Amino acid sequence: MKALAKLERGPGLTLTRVKRPEVGHNDVLIKIHRTAICGTDIHIWKWDDWAQKTIPVPMHVGHEYVGEIVEMGQEVRGFAIGDRVSGEGHITCGFCRNCRAGRRHLCRNTVGVGVNREGAFAEYLAIPAFNAFKIPPEISDDLASIFDPFGNATHTALSFNLVGEDVLITGAGPIGVMAAAIAKHVGARNVVITDINDYRLELARKMGATRAVNVSRESLRDVMADLHMTEGFDVGLEMSGVPSAFTSMLEAMNHGGKIALLGIPPAQTAIDWNQVIFKGLEIKGIYGREMFETWYKMVAMLQSGLDLSPIITHRFAADDYEKGFAAMLSGESGKVILDWTV
């Protein structure tokens, strides 16, 4: 089958032919319709330090996808040939304390599709049936293909009650922009998102952010004054991994505020712990999606009117993957979709 793989230890990916995956007794085989390019895939493309330490070579990658089930293992129940599915990209052990307690998103033995094992940038993908998630007919293939990052945004944004709250989001990448849309959808009062990328800040405006602030030109304090915010933000969603962004968030939080961290800052990043301790801030780290509560919430929000369509800005045939990665690398894109059916 056709697949997009890391064949050599260096930058780039190669469209190649690989063996169609075997289907275990508890697996489903998915014929891929669409995939989306993730920031993780950009790290793999660039072959940065993280990728060099993490990605097996050779291996085909990718973990954001939608497709249809074409084969099932003999032990699989609850699915049928032809079901349209996306899937949870974190494959968990099922036996550790967290898994057995129903906290699979905290499994210490997690294996990532397209990171630690063969991925979805291919014509077919085999995964455990447990990880497959049926997609309702009213949700398009394009939207279903971005359920993985949509899930990151959902898990982060819905970590705390947002109704009537003032929310600060630092980082207007696709996940941050989707988090802004989610926050407004569920009833936040003011949703302010910061970045230095005007293209993505404009996407955030289209998705419903109250204010999209280029912090290289505009003061967050001035924006807060314009919005008549006198006590600080109630909830912070840190999506950038940029130390200065986290510092500005800590300074802007109200006492008793709550922060969810999805962005990954450099190791040994220093912060002013006085801001955390004397403000009584609550800080929560976010990894992946809750299985499968996050997935049900994603579907419910789309069915109740959440519009994520503006975040999908580019579409290419899988054979034109280089154009897709160029769009992502340019910084002037939202989500980029690759079509494996043409």
Swiss-Prot record:
Zn(2+) 1 binds at C38, H63, E64. GO terms for molecular function: L-threonine 3-dehydrogenase activity; zinc ion binding. Its main location: cytoplasm. GO terms for biological process: L-threonine catabolic process to glycine. The record marks D148 as: Important for catalytic activity for the proton relay mechanism but does not participate directly in the coordination of zinc atom. Zn(2+) 2 binds at C93, C96, C99, C107. InterPro entries: ADH-like_C, ADH-like_N, ADH_Zn_CS, GroES-like_sf, L-Threonine_3-DHase, NAD(P)-bd_dom_sf, PKS_ER, Zn_alcohol_dh. GO terms for cellular component: cytoplasm. SMART domains: PKS_ER. Keywords: Cytoplasm, Metal-binding, NAD, Oxidoreductase, Zinc. Pathway: Amino-acid degradation; L-threonine degradation via oxydo-reductase pathway; glycine from L-threonine: step 1/2. It catalyses: L-threonine + NAD(+) = (2S)-2-amino-3-oxobutanoate + NADH + H(+). PANTHER family: L-THREONINE 3-DEHYDROGENASE (PTHR43401:SF2). Catalyzes the NAD(+)-dependent oxidation of L-threonine to 2-amino-3-ketobutyrate. Belongs to the zinc-containing alcohol dehydrogenase family. This is L-threonine 3-dehydrogenase. It comes from Burkholderia ambifaria (strain ATCC BAA-244 / DSM 16087 / CCUG 44356 / LMG 19182 / AMMD). The lineage of its organism: Bacteria, Pseudomonadati, Pseudomonadota, Betaproteobacteria, Burkholderiales.
